[in-house]
Amino acid sequence: MKRKWEERVKKVEELASYYERNPLPTVYKPRLSKPLQPSRVWKIFCRQADAFRFVKTCKEDVHVFALERNTQNGQRFYLVTTYQELWYYYTKGYKTSLMHCYEVIPEKDACKLYFDLEFYKAANPGADGKDMVAKLIELVSQKLKELYDVNCSARDVLNLDSSTDEKFSRHLIFLPCKTVFKDNIHVGNFVRTILQPAIRLVGSNVAAPIAEGGAGYTSQCSAPTVELDGPLTNLTAVEDASKGWPAIADQRKETETSHHGENSEFSFLIVNNKEGDKQLFVDLGVYTRNRNFRMYKSSKAGKNVILTIAEDNKFVPNCEENVSLEEAYFLSSLVCNVRFEDGTKILSSNFVEEEIKMSAFLRSKTTRSTREPMEGYQESPYPEIDCFVRSLINKDGVQGGIRQWNYFSGEEILVYDISGYRWCENIGRAHRSNNIMILVDLKKEVWYQKCHDPVCREKNFKSQSLPLPSRICLSSLFIEEEDHMVTDERENTEVTSHSNPADLSESSAYLAINTSQDTQWDNASDDAYLVETAEDVELAEAADYSLGYDTEEIPDEVLLEMSWKQDTCSKDDS
């Protein structure tokens, strides 16, 4: 008996000595089924800012994805994982939020050139979507060659389709060899630059039938900034600020006249929306900070139509070792999945020459330095305020709409250009031909009305300032509960980095952050936490410099710069 006991003690001592020399890892990180696949990282957050902070702490090549719940409020959660792990579970067919998955395009990250295209079929009975896509690819390829000396064809463009009986819808991902853009803001600048003739057609409010013949595209925009593995070289000249406003206005008229013939070649890009108003075939609202872009094989929440390979797609990816064709398509479709190799071109783009010249003139006329405003044609960075503005212009039997928004980050003012609703406080009635603007001051939490009408503008008229509803003021939007717990019908559910994605079908619908595991974030000051919240809500950071003048509003000259892109009428009301 004693001998057996001594043998056991000896074995235990030998094991203890072995594990002292070869200790177990402190954290066990299981891998996927294939040896070459990375260690698993799978963590879900309720807030986008928290997800990006977690990414910075990871050694693995992880990315942020948005998961949309199948609810009417469009609530989203944010998943941090690798491309390989996401694809591994993406194709398992689990009934989870992976069915409605979006790639989050981080600000300032290099990315591919991409497009979101759509039109309603009933409102555009003569539109040939496939032909329009082919013409757009031809146009963009020509501009890439003209401005950057980049060769591209339809065989370098991944064409994804999610069309329905009601709507034609495509995503295009351009994949020219060893070519990426500096970030998606520069992508947006490039797209707006090459589509200026079409944008002017929309602004002119002139019916433009869809062209059936080929389009002869001629460059009319300034050469953008190009970065080729080195510092940026600005190739765009800025006009002398000493020139006067009338001269620039006359020059604009001459330019519009000279390009009238060219504009007609871009008419294939003009479509009707549901209300019959003109809009672009290309959605210009998808080039914003931290944009959520729907992924290949995903559908919108509440919808069953997924993004699939289009019938007229000509792109075929190169399959690397241990990568299937389907996975290769998936990896090619990811906007931020870019590689930096020797000879990679990093493209950048400024605004069109016309806008840069006008900005230079305005800076000479105002004693301040203003950032270029953000702009868009659909949702602004503040959807709650968008809804409030729509409530102001949809009343008394009049159906108004938001034609365009502009965000002045330095002043924190949103300018909404209104269509279909022309009531003006200055004259006490609706203008006959000139549209109005609704301005929202986010700092003062008030709104007021101004006009495109020359008489009102000459008087520098603005209506009385009225307070915003408390529910949409930023001070209330930034207030969040300390615990972001979403309660299951039965009990609270935690999702940590060790949760099994296969169980997401039961837990992802009611997710919660395990705040005890993220104490490093909890220890941050309230002010820092509030700043991170603001960054998650806003699409543009507030200017970090002080203004050199005292004023309560944006000068009309600055508003005029933006209104030139829109439908303005110079006739006085009688």
Swiss-Prot record:
Keywords: Chromosome, Coiled coil, DNA damage, DNA repair, DNA-directed DNA polymerase, DNA-directed RNA polymerase, Manganese, Metal-binding, Mitochondrion, Nucleotidyltransferase, Nucleus, Transcription, Transferase, Zinc. Its cofactor is Mn(2+). Can act both with Mn(2+) and Mg(2+) as cofactor in vitro, but Mn(2+) is the preferred cofactor in vivo. Pfam families: Herpes_UL52. It is an enzyme of class 2 (transferase). Substrate binds at residues 76, 116-118, 167-171, 291-294, 300. It is found in: Nucleus; Mitochondrion matrix; Chromosome. One of its GO terms (molecular function) is zinc ion binding. The keyword Chaperone does not apply. It catalyses: ssDNA + n NTP = ssDNA/pppN(pN)n-1 hybrid + (n-1) diphosphate; DNA(n) + a 2'-deoxyribonucleoside 5'-triphosphate = DNA(n+1) + diphosphate. Mn(2+) binds at residues 116, 118. DNA primase and DNA polymerase required to tolerate replication-stalling lesions by bypassing them. Required to facilitate mitochondrial and nuclear replication fork progression by initiating de novo DNA synthesis using dNTPs and acting as an error-prone DNA polymerase able to bypass certain DNA lesions. Shows a high capacity to tolerate DNA damage lesions such as 8oxoG and abasic sites in DNA. The zinc knuckle motif binds zinc and is required for the DNA primase activity. It facilitates the binding and selection of the 5'-nucleotide of the newly synthesized primer and the recognition of preferred initiation sites. The presence of an Asp-Aaa-Glu (DxE) motif in the metal-binding active site favors the use of Mn(2+) ions to achieve optimal incoming nucleotide stabilization, especially required during primer synthesis. Glu-118 is required to stabilize the incoming nucleotide at the 3'-site. Belongs to the eukaryotic-type primase small subunit family. This is DNA-directed primase/polymerase protein. It comes from Gallus gallus (Chicken). The gene is PRIMPOL.
